[in-house]
UniProtKB/Swiss-Prot annotation:
Taxonomic superkingdom: Eukaryota
Pfam hit, one: Porin_3
Name of the protein this chain belongs to: Mitochondrial outer membrane protein porin
Protein family: Belongs to the eukaryotic mitochondrial porin family.
Organism placement in taxonomy: Eukaryota, Fungi, Dikarya, Ascomycota, Saccharomycotina
Native source organism of the sequence: Candida albicans (strain SC5314 / ATCC MYA-2876)
Other notes: Has antigenic properties. Elicits a specific immune response in systemic candidiasis human patients undergoing malignant hematological disorders.
Protein encoded by which gene: POR1
Keyword Calcium (UniProt): no
Keywords: Ion transport, Membrane, Mitochondrion, Mitochondrion outer membrane, Porin, Transmembrane, Transmembrane beta strand, Transport
Record-level Gene Ontology MF annotations: porin activity; voltage-gated monoatomic anion channel activity
Function according to Swiss-Prot or TrEMBL: Forms a channel through the cell membrane that allows diffusion of small hydrophilic molecules. The channel adopts an open conformation at low or zero membrane potential and a closed conformation at potentials above 30-40 mV. The open state has a weak anion selectivity whereas the closed state is cation-selective.
Amino acid sequence: MAPAAYSDLSKASNDLINKDFYHLSTAAVDVKTVAPNGVTFTVKGKTTKDDTISASVDAKYLDKATGLTLTQGWNNANALNTKIELSELLTPGLKGELDTSVVPNGARNAKLNFFYQQSAVNARLFFDLLKGPIATADLVVAHDGFTAGAELGYDISSAKVNKYSVGVGYANLNYGLAATATSNLSVFSAAYFHKVSPLVQVGAKATWDSIKSSNVNVEFATKYALDNTSFIKAKIADSGLTALSYTQELRPGVKLGLGASFDALKLAEPVHKLGFSLSFAA
């Protein structure tokens, strides 16, 4: 099994801290269906911070014989998104991807990406074709649960390195640790994740931006499984921001999420948020 990608060195703790909290959108709905020929349709909609609605529809087709995947998407910002993926490109473990986004009479983006995975290596290469162009590469190597990785960004037109970062980690079945130095080694973070029992998970992350602040920002989160179909989560940051959520599988393929957040340092002010999410899959 290949190690995690560089951006996922802290995935377990990041997911615990960030996923399945529903207060950021007052309402969110997504529907996923699969046609008899294997085409997957996904429709998503949610409210945004400025009280507008963000919506998108995607169709994804996979040809297992050739390893070709085509995803076509369209959103209410009138952006047409197309992704073409080809697995086992030239050699086992290598995947190529062309990802484009076009807004009529507006912005255009095109990225050419390559992914390579083997039992102890995970390497990625991203080309932003219309900006720069800029190449970003990252590499992770692993041995006995330990991982080490690095990321490098290079502006081809100016022949300059525009970013670099490094990270290390360790993970087993019950816990994981990770430390990274990003933004040209100016932002440092450390995270841990611990599966205390089959019912309880805890995790925390500390971040220090050596340029912007002398303070260390700390977040802590926990998850408790009520039963096989529901769980609750809570997180708190040193800033006082506290979030709670409840997730319930109503029936196979139907999931309801309820969330709330409040500022523990400003309980008398109207800064609290409520939200819900409803997901359907068939």
